[in-house]
Amino acid sequence: MVGANISTMSISDNDSTRFRPDFTGGVRIALIPERSIFGAEIDVLYSRQGTSSKKGLDDDNNSIRYLEKSHYLTVPVLLNIYLRKWKEEDEDESKIPRLRIGPQIGFCIGGNEVKEVKGRRKQQFITPWEKGSFNRIDYGVTAALSYWFVEVRYTFGMANVFKEGEKSTNHVISVTWSDVW
């Protein structure tokens, strides 16, 4: 599966965070019982997530803008609920609208933080083996609607993204295209 996502972080002391567009892609392992109303799947996805925000002024009265980007391997385990009964002419499950819901765990494999003041950027790269500011594990709940080869998915993060400081959680909306080979 491959697609685009928009993500943001809810940060407890900052109400000026914005969604930012990025990429997601990976593989799906599906257990589809024949002619059942339920199924299950496990996805392994690469997902770039983050946010941009304005955080006040510096000592010279210049506005400060932050951009946080993080790179995750996410593993959602989803229950598939088929929204109508199978018919004789149904060749495959992709033609039946589906609701997918379940938990997701994410592993931060890197990221960077950019601080921009007066058009000048200062960037800090974070790798998983560094003691950076990102927590390595993220978890949340995922819900999706799928039809044919298109899926719209929302992930509500529940883990704190940063090791220290304000409480912040990931929120991701993605649209993906997938095929079964």
How would you label these PLM feature ranges?
Residues 1-30:
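Short glycine/proline- and aromatic-enriched beta-strand/turn motifs that initiate or cap beta-hairpins
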Residues 2, 23, 38-42, 75, ...:
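Transmembrane beta-strands of outer-membrane beta-barrel proteins
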Residues 8-19, 49-71, 108-142:
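Extracellular/periplasm-exposed beta-strand and loop segments of Gram-negative cell-envelope proteins
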